[in-house]
Amino acid sequence: MAGRYDSNPFEEDDVNPFSEQARGKAGGQPSYGGGAFYMPNPRNVPSVSSNSRLSPLPPEPAAFGATVDIPLDSSKDLKNREKELQAREAELNKREKELKRREEAAARAGIVIEEKNWPPFLPLIHHDITNEIPSHLQRMQYVAFASFLGLACCLFWNVIAVTSAWVKGEGVKIWLLAIIYFISGVPGAYVLWYRPLYNAMRTDSALKFGLFFLVYLFHILFCVFSAVAPPVVFEGKSLAGILPAIDLISKNALVGIFYFVGFGLFCVESLLSIWVIQQVYMYFRGSGKAAEMKRDATRGAMRAAF
């Protein structure tokens, strides 16, 4: 039996394979430990010379120094642009100061610059109840504005009703009168009574209130007259009132219905207008504007007399 510290007969010697002695020994002795890679005569294997190595590729320059053409403005161009911007800024400041000076001069002269803002899709007039009319008068002004729009609606429907009567053989004269009512009635109402009321509410002017009352009474009379449409002008058929509606319903039901609708619209407009003038008159009396208007009228009469 082998001892505890006996050497292993299968253990290889501690030999440095890179030493010259080991190289000579390996060249002189056959090797049987190669297994499947055993070579009977290692001398027949051609040796690899140092000159058989692959030559390295030639070095290529790195792209760190590649130039990119980026157009940069010179300092002279930058200075020119800066001067141009400064000139534009100075011109804008000059225009702003001039506009401010004109606005202040207009304000001192009592001139109010009004921007057209209504209707929104095609501004024709300046109308801003929320910002220009006192809060306690806004409801009254809105109802007056509704009566103005109601008159425009009545006259427009009147054109439709009279057009249907003209198509059914009632003559072209009534249609021309209906067109005249619409073209002259809507802008006339705005200029003669709605705008004076708007300015009276905004400036609290007794004289403008008086102009409104005078013209608005004629407006109410016209609405009542249109609702009845007596046979005064062209048998009254130029207005869609109750009397021509009764006359036409027996001839043509559709035309008669159009006239009855017009009669209803004129009735609603008359009632709304009566409510407006009543409310405005109550405010006019309660605020002391009636007495102020009397004093102004007395002063005007005395000045005219002397």
Curated annotation (Swiss-Prot):
Q: Where is the composition biased (Gly residues)?
A: 25-36
Where in or outside the cell it occurs: the entry states: Cell membrane; Cytoplasmic vesicle, Secretory vesicle membrane
List all topological domains (Cytoplasmic).
1-141, 278-306
TM segment ranges: 142-162, 174-194, 209-229, 257-277
Region entry Disordered, spans: 1-66
Give the UniProt keywords, A-Z.
Cell membrane, Coiled coil, Cytoplasmic vesicle, Membrane, Transmembrane, Transmembrane helix, Transport
Coiled coil: which residue ranges? 72-109
Does this entry carry the keyword Transport? Answer: yes
Entry GO CC: early endosome; plasma membrane; recycling endosome membrane; trans-Golgi network membrane; transport vesicle membrane
Pfam family, any one = SCAMP
Q: According to its record, how does it sit in the membrane?
A: Multi-pass membrane protein
Function recorded in the entry: Probably involved in membrane trafficking.
PANTHER family membership: SECRETORY CARRIER-ASSOCIATED MEMBRANE PROTEIN 1, SECRETORY CARRIER-ASSOCIATED MEMBRANE PROTEIN SCAMP
Q: Which family does it belong to?
A: Belongs to the SCAMP family.
Q: What is this protein called?
A: Secretory carrier-associated membrane protein 1
Record lineage: Eukaryota, Viridiplantae, Streptophyta, Embryophyta, Tracheophyta
Gene responsible for this protein: SCAMP1
